Each structure stands twice: as structure tokens, then as C-alpha cells.
């Protein structure tokens, strides 16, 4: 391993982008990092190059994705109806977790990181992703947390112990952020999906994350008003930078044809 590390992370805002296109971009950046790591193994120490890191933020048109450990039975409608009636697409992908929904109004984050630049611990990595969302929700006055044995971020997470409940941590357990990652050679891809202004009716057509006895929510649903996605994105990235000791570098991209911005 290269003993020098790179804490810089290039942030890219992709706007509203098709799932396949975003997946291709993840794969391209992932491969770039892995190829550099493999190349470094063949070079003397002084010639080795620092590996890059990326943080992608986007929204997707309506799409359902199924992870490697998921069950297609958790998709409750046939794929023809998905396309023809719901205007959605469906992908089987190589990440952990079961089935989830992505759509407009949801903040999706894809960290493409070389964990050799930070720490080589996948469990810690996932917990820090969750923590960045928990801290972001706290900025809006919401007391979010984790549920033992389940990934993601939840409200009502300790509903069985009302005496421990904090502000707005009331009601049944409901998921506000899904998490699913892949890592190879300590390089990560995929990430998290935070429901901000999401149309939650699209979750009615799946068993979200394969969990039958819990529901989903969004920031807008909890606060009873729409929330600036840009503001949420800025808060998430700052918490990620603090938790991972990152130096964020903004990358200006050409306007995406689906968004014009």
C-alpha cells in the first residue's frame, strides 16, 4: 500500500440523472482508483501516485434497485406495470441490501473512496455514513438514530423505550435513509439515499429493504413542509468532511441535459 494518503475528495453534483448513467459513472471512477492502486504495486515507492476520491450527489428518475442479498418477491408489482403505469425502471445491482426506491426529491450520495486514504474498516465506514445523516437530521430538529440489526437511519428508533425518546423521536419506527454499499480492494461505491421531498407512495409497491413491519418517511413529511435539497446536500457533505477528515474540492460539471442545471 502507498504509505502516503490523499484526504482530498472531489465533490460532483450530477443533478437528475438516469440510474444506469450514474452507475456507469460510479464504475468508471471506481475502476480509475483500483487501476491506480494496482499500478502503484509495480512502482518504486517514490514513483507511486496518490489515489483519488470522489463524492457524487444526485437525484434519479423513478427507479427500483435490488441488492445482491435481496429477494425479487419484495417487488410487489410486475415489471410491465412498473414501466407502463408507474414510469419506473428496475435494476439488479451489486451492492448489499434488499430492494429500495429512488426518485425525484431524494438525495442520493455515492462516495467512491479509497479507504486506504482514511481507514480500512467497512463496519466503521457504514456507521459514519449513517452518522452523517443523523447529524444532518439533527440540524432540522429531528432525533434520528439506528436500530440494532438493521442498516440505515430511522426515526422512532427507540419507540419501545419512551423514556429515552428525544425531540420528535416519537411514533412507530420509520426509515428516512437507506444505505447499501459495495467495496473491493478497499474502494467503495454505491452509498445512501435520504428521503427529503420524496413521493413516498412509490414505496407502496415494494417491501422496502425487505422489512415488513416498519414504514418509511421523509424530511418533508416530518417537518410538514418542503425542504431545500441543496441545503440538505450542503449539510450532509460538511458532516461527511468532519467525520472522515476530508478536504472537499468542488468539481464544476457541464449542465446535465435532464436538468439544465
What are these regions (language model features)?
Residues 173-179:
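Local beta-strand/beta-hairpin segments that build beta-sheet-rich folds
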Residues 139, 180-181, 201, 209:
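Glycine/proline-rich loop-helix segments at beta-alpha junctions forming the active-site rim
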Residues 114-116, 182, 195-197, 222:
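Solvent-exposed residues in well-ordered beta-strands and their adjoining turns
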Residues 107, 184-198:
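Conserved phosphate/anionic-ligand binding catalytic regions in large, soluble enzymes, centered on
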Residues 201-261:
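C-terminal accessory segment of soluble enzyme catalytic cores
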Residues 1-170, 227, 257-261:
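N-terminal lobe of the biotin/lipoate ligase/transferase fold
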Amino acid at each position: 500500500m502507498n504509505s502516503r494518503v490523499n484526504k482530498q475528495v472531489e465533490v460532483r453534483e450530477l443533478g437528475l440523472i438516469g440510474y444506469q448513467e450514474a452507475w456507469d459513472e460510479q464504475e468508471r471512477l471506481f475502476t480509475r482508483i483500483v487501476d491506480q492502486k494496482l499500478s502503484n504495486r509495480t512502482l518504486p515507492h517514490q514513483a507511486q501516485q496518490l489515489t483519488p476520491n470522489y463524492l457524487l450527489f444526485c437525484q434519479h428518475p423513478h427507479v427500483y434497485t435490488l441488492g445482491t442479498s435481496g429477494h425479487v418477491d419484495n417487488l410487489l408489482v410486475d415489471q410491465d406495470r412498473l414501466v407502463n403505469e408507474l414510469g419506473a425502471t428496475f435494476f439488479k445491482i451489486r451492492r448489499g441490501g434488499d430492494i429500495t426506491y429512488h426518485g425525484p426529491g431524494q438525495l442520493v450520495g455515492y462516495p467512491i473512496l479509497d479507504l486506504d486514504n482514511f481507514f480500512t474498516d467497512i463496519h466503521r465506514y457504514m456507521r459514519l455514513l449513517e452518522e452523517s445523516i443523523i447529524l444532518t437530521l439533527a440540524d432540522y430538529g429531528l432525533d434520528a438514530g439506528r436500530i440494532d440489526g438493521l442498516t440505515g437511519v430511522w426515526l422512532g428508533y427507540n419507540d419501545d423505550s419512551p423514556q429515552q425518546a428525544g425531540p420528535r423521536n416519537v411514533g412507530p419506527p420509520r426509515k428516512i435513509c437507506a444505505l447499501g454499499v459495495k467495496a473491493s480492494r478497499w474502494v467503495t461505491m454505491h452509498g445512501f439515499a435520504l428521503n427529503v421531498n420524496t413521493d413516498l407512495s412509490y414505496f407502496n409497491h415494494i417491501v422496502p429493504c425487505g422489512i415488513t413491519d416498519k414504514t418509511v418517511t421523509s424530511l418533508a413529511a416530518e417537518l410538514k413542509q418542503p425542504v431545500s435539497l441543496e441545503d440538505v446536500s450542503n449539510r450532509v457533505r460538511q458532516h461527511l468532511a468532519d467525520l472522515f477528515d476530508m478536504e472537499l474540492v468542488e468539481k464544476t460539471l457541464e449542465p446535465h441535459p435532464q436538468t439544465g442545471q
